[in-house]
């Protein structure tokens, strides 16, 4: 997602060979400039190393929770998770993406401003986390969907406030570390977090059921906050960035200009996801929601590598744009879209062949039709492409277009599910996601095309001025 890389660590990194190596291979195959390829590969390498272990442990935690809670209990657990996701999206105020954008943009050119942005983000994150966690505790009885086991579901909703609090404050720290390209530190943290989540989920689910599984999520998030906190302090010290709260009010336009549309866009999507899961639970019961949640883990596997690529290329692209490297930006963007799309398609194809065996990991009672698996994997492939194209919107200053695209995505998802859920149950939800992501690919593709045309025009004008004024 940069131009200056980690200067203070350059001495510790061997120089790349001038005419061979995997960096050159990526440059030739994708068109990404050599320097960007090497930074991309370093970032992807560290992110992949941490995420493989961390996400594998998290996936194992889901399997353990499903086996300990049973089909009905796992469906309730899935509803708690989507409810927390909707609340935390609103509480986060888009601070993760805001911090990533401005830290990656100013970390070299204006470290003082980067420190003020970090101070503003941390202050806003803690205030919002406290307010919305309290709101979740108060609203828990109304958020519990369905008549069965309502008291235990309400208690789990209230316990999830701990998870929501730390997830909210973790958002800006994760964005800051990504903006600083601290992918090695993030990788190590992901490993520790994933293993801790697995152990806590197993122990708490086995002894305390649904409430235990929910509490385990909260304790894991608290550990993640602590690890991010010390990692961010170390990175800021390394780059001479001083986090300060003096002058934060002057930087509030950054929140208005970037956080507001980012929060609005994410909130629209999160509420749609929560409503869709609740609608499926009402129409078909928690057992069917549990099946969908199990199959949804296959979607997360499809997204795994593309999300790592996107996590690395987003600050890289943002820094390139800030530095005026328009040619490098265009090549890197197109290369990242091609790379993400191809890995997503490959993963979806493999999982489509092994889908039935995958579901058996969650227990014998977890079964899903081939149609459900194929529909959700197809939707995941479109999601990969849409997420890659989204980088053109993110790097530009046009996030209100993201709000419009998410609004269309939400309308398509909700309308399609409303028309089909009563007849087709869980498969209807998968088909609704397929339709929604199809619309997003079209809209993001059009926006990316428009954005690249603008950059090409700007590059041509810059070349003309250079030639006319040597």
Which residues fall in each region the model found?
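Transmembrane helical elements of multi-pass membrane transporters/channels
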Residues: 42-59, 193, 197, 213, ...
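Interhelical loop/hinge segments that connect adjacent transmembrane helices in multipass membrane
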Residues: 23-40, 228-273, 324-327, 451-470
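Membrane-water interface segments that mark the loop-to-transmembrane alpha-helix transition
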Residues: 10-16, 20-23, 38-54, 80, ...
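Signature of the first transmembrane helix
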Residues: 4, 15-24, 36-97, 133, ...
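Interfacial segments at transmembrane-helix termini and the short loops linking adjacent helices
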Residues: 140-160, 286-287, 326-327, 353-381, ...
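Helix-loop junctions and terminal segments of transmembrane helices
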Residues: 93-108, 179, 237-240, 295, ...
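Membrane-interface junctions at transmembrane-helix termini in multi-pass inner-membrane proteins
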Residues: 165-188, 378-408
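Hydrophobic alpha-helical transmembrane segments
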Residues: 154-158, 187-237, 410-412, 426-451
């Amino acid at each position: 997602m940069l131009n200056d890389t980690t200067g203070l660590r350059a001495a510790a990194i061997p120089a790349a060979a001038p005419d061979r190596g995997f960096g050159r291979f990526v440059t030739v195959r994708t068109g990404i400039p050599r320097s960007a390829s090497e930074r991309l590969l370093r970032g992807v390498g560290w992110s992949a190393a941490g995420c493989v272990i961390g996400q594998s442990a998290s996936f194992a935690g889901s399997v353990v929770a499903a086996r300990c809670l049973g089909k009905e209990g796992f469906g309730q657990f899935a509803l708690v998770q989507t409810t927390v996701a909707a609340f935390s999206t609103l509480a986060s105020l888009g601070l993760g993406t805001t911090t990533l954008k401005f830290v990656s943009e100013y970390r070299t050119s204006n470290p003082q401003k980067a420190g003020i942005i970090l101070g503003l983000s941390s202050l806003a994150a803690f205030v919002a986390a406290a307010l919305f966690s309290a709101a979740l505790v108060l609203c828990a009885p109304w958020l519990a969907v369905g008549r069965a086991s309502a008291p235990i579901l309400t208690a789990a909703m209230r316990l999830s406030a701990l998870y929501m609090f730390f997830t909210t404050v973790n958002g800006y720290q994760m964005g800051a570390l990504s903006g600083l390209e601290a992918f090695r530190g993030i990788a190590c943290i992901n490993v520790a977090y994933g293993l801790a989540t697995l152990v806590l989920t197993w122990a708490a689910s086995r002894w305390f059921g649904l409430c235990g599984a929910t509490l385990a999520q909260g304790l894991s998030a608290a550990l993640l906050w602590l690890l991010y906190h010390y990692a961010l302090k170390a990175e800021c010290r390394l780059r001479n960035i001083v986090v300060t709260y003096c002058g934060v009010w002057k930087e509030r336009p950054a929140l208005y200009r970037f956080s507001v549309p980012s929060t609005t866009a994410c909130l629209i999507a999160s509420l749609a996801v929560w409503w869709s899961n609740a609608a499926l639970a009402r129409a078909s019961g928690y057992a069917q929601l549990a099946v969908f949640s199990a199959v949804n883990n296959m979607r997360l596997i499809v997204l795994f590598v593309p999300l790592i690529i996107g996590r690395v290329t987003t600050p890289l692209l943002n820094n390139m744009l800030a530095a005026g490297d328009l040619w490098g930006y265009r090549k890197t963007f197109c290369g990242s879209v091609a790379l993400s799309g191809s890995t997503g398609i490959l993963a979806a194809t493999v999982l489509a062949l092994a889908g039935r065996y995958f579901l058996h990991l969650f227990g014998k009672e977890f079964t899903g039709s081939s149609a459900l698996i194929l529909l959700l994997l197809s939707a995941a492939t479109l999601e990969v492409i849409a997420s890659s194209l989204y980088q053109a919107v993110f790097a530009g200053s046009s996030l209100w277009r993201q709000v419009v695209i998410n609004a269309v995505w939400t309308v398509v998802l909700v309308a399609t599910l409303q028309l089909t859920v009563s007849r087709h149950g869980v498969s209807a939800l998968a088909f609704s996601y397929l339709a929604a992501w199809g619309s997003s690919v079209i809209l993001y593709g059009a926006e990316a095309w428009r954005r690249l045309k603008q950059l090409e025009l700007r590059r041509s004008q810059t070349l003309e001025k250079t030639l006319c004024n040597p």
